[in-house]
Amino acid sequence: MSGKPAARQGDMTQYGGPIVQGSAGVRIGAPTGVACSVCPGGMTSGNPVNPLLGAKVLPGETDLALPGPLPFILSRTYSSYRTKTPAPVGVFGPGWKAPSDIRLQLRDDGLILNDNGGRSIHFEPLLPGEAVYSRSESMWLVRGGKAAQPDGHTLARLWGALPPDIRLSPHLYLATNSAQGPWWILGWSERVPGAEDVLPAPLPPYRVLTGMADRFGRTLTYRREAAGDLAGEITGVTDGAGREFRLVLTTQAQRAEEARTSSLSSSDSSRPLSASAFPDTLPGTEYGPDRGIRLSAVWLMHDPAYPESLPAAPLVRYTYTEAGELLAVYDRSNTQVRAFTYDAQHPGRMVAHRYAGRPEMRYRYDDTGRVVEQLNPAGLSYRYLYEQDRITVTDSLNRREVLHTEGGAGLKRVVKKELADGSVTRSGYDAAGRLTAQTDAAGRRTEYGLNVVSGDITDITTPDGRETKFYYNDGNQLTAVVSPDGLESRREYDEPGRLVSETSRSGETVRYRYDDAHSELPATTTDATGSTRQMTWSRYGQLLAFTDCSGYQTRYEYDRFGQMTAVHREEGISLYRRYDNRGRLTSVKDAQGRETRYEYNAAGDLTAVITPDGNRSETQYDAWGKAVSTTQGGLTRSMEYDAAGRVISLTNENGSHSVFSYDALDRLVQQGGFDGRTQRYHYDLTGKLTQSEDEGLVILWYYDESDRITHRTVNGEPAEQWQYDGHGWLTDISHLSEGHRVAVHYGYDDKGRLTGECQTVENPETGELLWQHETKHAYNEQGLANRVTPDSLPPVEWLTYGSGYLAGMKLGGTPLVEYTRDRLHRETVRSFGSMAGSNAAYELTSTYTPAGQLQSQHLNSLVYDRDYGWSDNGDLVRISGPRQTREYGYSATGRLESVRTLAPDLDIRIPYATDPAGNRLPDPELHPDSTLTVWPDNRIAEDAHYVYRHDEYGRLTEKTDRIPAGVIRTDDERTHHYHYDSQHRLVFYTRIQHGEPLVESRYLYDPLGRRMAKRVWRRERDLTGWMSLSRKPEVTWYGWDGDRLTTVQTDTTRIQTVYEPGSFTPLIRVETENGEREKAQRRSLAETLQQEGSENGHGVVFPAELVRLLDRLEEEIRADRVSSESRAWLAQCGLTVEQLARQVEPEYTPARKAHLYHCDHRGLPLALISEDGNTAWSAEYDEWGNQLNEENPHHVYQPYRLPGQQHDEESGLYYNRHRYYDPLQGRYITQDPMGLKGGWNLYQYPLNPLQQIDPMGLLQTWDDARSGACTGGVCGVLSRIIGPSKFDSTADAALDALKETQNRSLCNDMEYSGIVCKDTNGKYFASKAETDNLRKESYPLKRKCPTGTDRVAAYHTHGADSHGDYVDEFFSSSDKNLVRSKDNNLEAFYLATPDGRFEALNNKGEYIFIRNSVPGLSSVCIPYHD
């Protein structure tokens, strides 16, 4: 190693051009640009300690942050580590750093930058105008004295945005960690020498932070005292929005005098304060020289937006020990929020700290000042053993983790990690300490290619050889990502570096326009449909108005602290919020005056929610803020945790327990249900589930080298098999069901979008195709999935406006349904029939309350009119129609407990009684002799009508007529028997009486659990007169589009259903006789050419791309509109349109009957309406879906019940996608396949079925039953067992999680958050989204990644209306601060907005992209309250 300089960026190449990718100042063999960092490698342990340095650390704690451009963010970071070249002690005392504690030491042999993270970064001296980049710390340092940087230089644009006097001054230095800024301006507090001075004043041998400047010319200014005791210290700040803050500083002498005065005036003479206890001066410490100057308070002195409404108290206040150590922090309400204790022998060495309302964490150090133990009185404690290149961390559960390191000081990195279970992972780094490779516990290696200068990742190669490539512009902004499947996403930026367009993998582009040249906030966004949204911002960067693509506006109001106080939507919907003096939300009130109130404990945990009717929901917490019990309506659930914070026991409302056990890596290995059912789990070295045991069932899981599941076995027998194409896209899933080979096949276009799904059932012995059902999907030029072609039906086309709001529906080009919408895009008028939209025979008008609830649905025919009444809590309490009124009563927990039906000469009240856990009980009013009060295991053994038996899996196996006591038994009771497959799916049902079967049925399923067929044998009289089961079964086939049943085919007819988009509410019913369908059967052009294209008669197989071209050509030929593009490729093949047209088989249009489903507010069909407006069928139901009466003069087959359910006449059950629902009990007959993720009672259907539905049989409930459900693709039934889905990018992982979470977030109006983790394979997965203790705000970094994986990103939602200091539709300032904090080690932060956008920030707090990718409020639900 020579120690000679490497290339500088001002040097010339042999061709005469400047080196723009060199690393100026980086000496070969010298440590320039390397930090003595607080957190080398970003590693922390426990609460928290940096084991690599043996330092107690506290990453940034923010005390003050008001929104605005270049805001004044006052935060503190602490480290007990002592650098060898420390800066002077800052205003928070020894060990602490503030954002302004940036100091550049100017030495003859080099420069030392002491930053606010505690790092000391060494650089070689710089000439005027010269720039240097620290690769290990990702930081630029530039000396002034140059008007411009060379073209193509990474900092050229950012440098040009600086005022000329700053750029041209050789006495100023500037630092930044991003080519997009901001700059930290390093100057001095003394007077700048003027031109008239004969001899300039000597400059100090250091530079301090005097301000900040961003790429738009905005500045934040620090005012430093020029003379006196406070010379050089910051006493005032003007932020980028013009706010002015005063920083009150005190000297050690002033604090000593105050302490003496306070002691003399104190009545407690037993503790006189001696002079030595509080000295007037402070000696130097291991943390640097100490002048004793401390920050005691910060006041807001001027606010341009609120000049007459300034706070009467400081925004934050601090107190100190006699040694000048930070003792306590007080918020703007003068509440103590933090407390600290230090070692009396080592000033500044923290030995304990505490948050308000939380226990005290304590620390012990060795003689060298390294932490050897952290003591947690209410959780895990840790011990640290330091050896040469090796640190051993042992927790209080005696789990040991060994870190093997290489390198020194700021380049120390963990290269080998021995985990608590004995597995080992390895990491590789380049010379700058940047990660280049990871090897997982199974020995599989993931490699990261880096730009040698910037450190940006240029490619990732996973162990299976698949590669993802990343491209950047001169400003190090990501411009393109090419995924392993070859699809590419792109981004474009304007001159200041603002995102102007973002093109997704599937080709949709969103564009951004900026009206203000000095702002990064867009004025408009235009999505792929051409729809434009407008935003108006305050001077503080807060959204004041949002105007959607239809010109409809939402307005926002804020208080002086930036907290949102009101939201005003169209149609008169408003929400108002109030906060306490600590900034916590205390109430939310709607436009009708209905108020929900919130209470908190000292730690800030939400302890009570009081609804408008006065009901309280209370939550109690343990010492660390984990909920230990929730009580609502007198019913309590409780949770118990172990020292590691893992849930080990749940106690439900009945007092029953569910228990959990974990392995050394915190993975669940055993759980016992409330009923004693035991399940166990085993994992491989990389954490993938390989074996699960469920009582007597043993399931083995197998994966390919890309960690994709390939097949499973159950008790040694083959089960499901998965197949993927070269892109990695799932193409086939198959298995055997009841002796039949059942498969699902997927097709995609060249952009990776699903174009078709085909289900097949074959005889495995003969290969005979017994059933095939295919659904095709098409997309318009804007990328909207607006066209679906059901099997054997003409295309269904959705007519939309704006960004996809539904305006109408066509079937085969014929308009059937039209919609009119209000200014919130809610449906107000729906018309159906051949005259839809003009004088339609069916016209449904909907109105809404001022709070946004459905108020009425009136038809031009009065028979189905309905009016809805709501309580202050938002409970549906009344439905009134022409014939009757139903009134509903609820418990304090929101359960439906009674229904009263009122009509002329009719007044009936039906009660519904449940035990505390929600299991149905005989109602005391109807069964006063019943002694049942609780079902401890949630398994109902009997009711007024039946006796039930369950097996070890909790599945209902037998149901027998109940013979009341005292009644003579005649042995004529009927017994129902239920049999299941290894996936707990009902496969055989029989009903027996007098020992003879009355009916038998068998059911087939596809690998996703969707029912493909049922066969029913009924008891009938044969030719000899004997009664026996029929020899030939009644066969019904089923076809699916995603999770929605779209086709039901019997021996005589086929019924097909079109649903409302994104919903389980049926819209159109099309019935076709089988004979008519057979007449219409024909080959497609592609099929004809493939079958007749070979001389040997065996046919040929065309590539998928050719099949797509021929399918498109066939459509064009039939429409007599052949495109020039099609003619061109035909000509290239030497063919003409006429030749191909002769091969197109003629079409026969079968006779079809179309009806509209007229549904209730939940999506339950009440009537079938013909195109001429007549009612072909109608029925009435109770609240749990039981049919009370039916008018069916035409013998119409209508099996649909509550959304997602189909009635089976043979058993009386409703098939509900993943389970079977018993409407008589209002619950399922088997346990939830999602386990506790679906709710604590695994049998439970929503206990308020009037407002909540479960279309998937998984207890994923939606408050607005008509509006939304996860309909596309494979539902995550297996997620609890096989682990989370994994992706090639953090964005894909976050998007998947947000799509799953958004519906719940919007309907519950709660913020949810989670993190994205990276496994040792380089794959990304998201944690489950959670909300914090029912708060409106959610902090993602409370979540932890599984042991052995790394936290790399975070995501969150904003609910429907934010209840805190942020704007619904964009990242808040605190969000940006979170992702900018290097201590969090986040690569990106993601957000799902109420408007349906997916937004992303990089780790510099800059927008990466905004695109419409998640469900929005208008398509999901508009909640009435929080």
Curated annotation (Swiss-Prot):
Extract the coiled-coil ranges from the record.
none
Known InterPro entries for this protein? DUF4329, DUF6531, RHS, Rhs_assc_core, RHS_domain, RHS_repeat, T6SS_VgrG/RHS, YD
Which GO BP terms, alphabetically?
cellular response to sulfur starvation
Segments annotated as sequence repeats: 334-356, 357-378, 379-421, 422-442, 443-464, 465-485, 486-506, 507-529, 530-550, 551-571, 572-592, 593-613, 614-633, 634-654, 655-675, 676-695, 696-715, 716-738, 739-762, 812-832, 833-861, 862-882, 883-905, 906-941, 942-970, 971-995, 996-1030, 1173-1197
Q: Name one Pfam family in it.
A: RHS
Locate the region 28 X approximate tandem repeats: 320-1197
Q: What induces it?
A: Repressed by H-NS, induced by LeuO. Part of the rhsD-ybbC operon.
Mind telling me which NCBIfam families this protein's record contains? Rhs_assc_core, RHS_core, YD_repeat_2x
Q: What PANTHER family would the database entry show?
A: PROTEIN RHSA-RELATED, PTHR32305
Q: What is this protein called?
A: Protein RhsD
